[in-house]
Amino acid sequence: MKTFVAKPETVKRDWYVVDATGKTLGRLATELARRLRGKHKAEYTPHVDTGDYIIVINADKVAVTGRKETDKVYYWHTGYVGGIKQATFKEMIARRPEAVIEIAVKGMLPKGPLGRAMFRKLKVYAGAQHEHTAQQPQVLDI
């Protein structure tokens, strides 16, 4: 029996919407990364993007455990000399809540062109509204 290998042109991708209200950040991000890669499908192939499109709503209501709200620090660099910046989880949620989920999921995806293609299928919104109703996404309970 020959091993099945998925081909990029035959992969069927579904659209799902996930509500992040009250969900733990890491547990949510691992499941999102798994579904973006396509590991939940029987036809999963490591070198082919077999994952689905995922819309995350209410990103501003995601939860963390322990003291991470004040202790977890995000760092980035502006590109200028001495341009290192930092913000706590609480400040990031106030400033740009989508980035918190995006950073968590991006770190769990493969590095390289395939990982970037998978990451592009993730759509994160701070509020309850999204602009993908035409795709008729199914509700995914995580």
UniProtKB/Swiss-Prot annotation:
Entries under Pfam families matching the protein: Ribosomal_L13
GO terms for cellular component: cytosolic large ribosomal subunit
Annotated TM spans: none
GO biological process: negative regulation of translation; translation
Family annotation (CDD domains): Ribosomal_L13 (cd00392)
Molecular function terms, GO-annotated: mRNA binding; structural constituent of ribosome
InterPro entries referenced in this protein's UniProt entry, alphabetically: Ribosomal_uL13, Ribosomal_uL13_bac-type, Ribosomal_uL13_CS, Ribosomal_uL13_sf
Known role: This protein is one of the early assembly proteins of the 50S ribosomal subunit, although it is not seen to bind rRNA by itself. It is important during the early stages of 50S assembly.
Name under which the protein is recorded: Large ribosomal subunit protein uL13
Source lineage: Bacteria, Pseudomonadati, Pseudomonadota, Gammaproteobacteria, Pasteurellales
